[in-house]
Amino acid sequence: MKDSIKAKLQSLIERHEEVSALLSEAGIISDQNKFRDLSKEYSHLEPIVKAFKEYTQALEDKQAAYEMLNEKDAELVEMAKEELKLANEAIEKLESELQIFLLPRDPNDDANVFLEIRAGTGGDEASIFSGDLFKMYSKYAEQRGWKIEVISASEGEHGGYKEIISRIYGDGVYSQLKFESGAHRVQRVPATESQGRIHTSACTVAVMPEADEVEGIDINPADIKVDTFRASGAGGQHVNKTDSAIRITHIPTGVVVECQDQRSQHKNRAAAMSMLKSKLLQAEIDKQQKEQSDTRKSLVGSGDRSERIRTYNYPQGRVTDHRINLTLYKLDEVMEGSLDSIIQPLILEHQADLLATMSDE
């Protein structure tokens, strides 16, 4: 392991001890925000410290085993060889883990998200598939213990949605869903197809981290135009009686957001403002990623909504993620929310990309 990496790890261990001491101070305990932030930092540092201690122990075990090789007893020498092998394997594994821990951390990884699914080419079939995607993400969220709420929905004429926007909140939502942005293509025989022909249609998915005050997304009230209108569709009878739905236009950028699924105009406005901040934050993230891609090409993290990232082929029961050439023949499981078999390889690919960048620097 490089001395620079060891030095960085040592500084993190010292910070872990410092944070641990701070968390027991009365002034910190009484300040909810500081206590929450330090608790989050402590939980982030804890596995790093644990892995580094195991790494240090493995180095000591290796040295002890190496010294045992000089013993005259043949049985002890064989034991030393086995212990040396195990120590080397542990060192290699822990070095990889520690390098990943040191990768630049996405500041939005802990954020909740807005999930936007829009029907693209394919007419009614695209709307139906957008409904299927929403169910898939809803089931995945349920499996991970997250909560999901619909912010706005425009239903398709024959089922599904022309567009549906939801908020997903829980632990580490953005870290798991951020690579889902892009064009999702489906190949299947529609229920209305009498000739049994396979149709291709597509939906676009956008995953945006929910912006809060710490993101520094400030909106000048003079830069927005707020309209109220009568809600329609999901939301029940109550919303049809009042002009409770909200549409906010951000004049400088032309970004428009709507919210109609909350029970009051006040709640709809708050949800719409939160979504507007997230869209402006996402625009800034997209800009930064574009600047980075000018110097290096990332297979996974471009987040370009127009980029075709995945194909769902129903006749073959196949799902293919085109960014990492991953093909799985378990479409039914994926559509039931078993997404980790796709998401985790994407995360590993992204980490490998970052590690390669670190090696080049």
From Swiss-Prot:
Q: Protein biosynthesis as a keyword?
A: yes
Q: What's the protein called, per UniProt? A: Peptide chain release factor 1
**What is known about its processing and modification?**
Methylated by PrmC. Methylation increases the termination efficiency of RF1.
Q: Which InterPro entries match?
A: PCRF (IPR005139), Pep_chain_release_fac_I (IPR000352), Pep_chain_release_fac_I_sf (IPR045853), Prokaryotic/Mito_RF (IPR050057), RF-1 (IPR004373)
Q: Which Pfam families match?
A: PCRF, RF-1
Where are the compositionally biased (Basic and acidic residues) regions? 286-297
Q: What is the lineage of its organism?
A: Bacteria, Pseudomonadati, Pseudomonadota, Gammaproteobacteria, Thiotrichales
| Protein family (similarity comment) | Belongs to the prokaryotic/mitochondrial release factor family.
Where are the stretches annotated Disordered? 286-313
State where it is primarily located.
Answer: cytoplasm
Described by its record, this protein's role is as follows: Peptide chain release factor 1 directs the termination of translation in response to the peptide chain termination codons UAG and UAA.
Query: Which keywords annotate this record?
Result: Cytoplasm, Methylation, Protein biosynthesis
Where's it found, cell-wise? Cytoplasm
A cellular component term from Gene Ontology for this protein is: cytoplasm
- Highest taxon above the source species: Bacteria
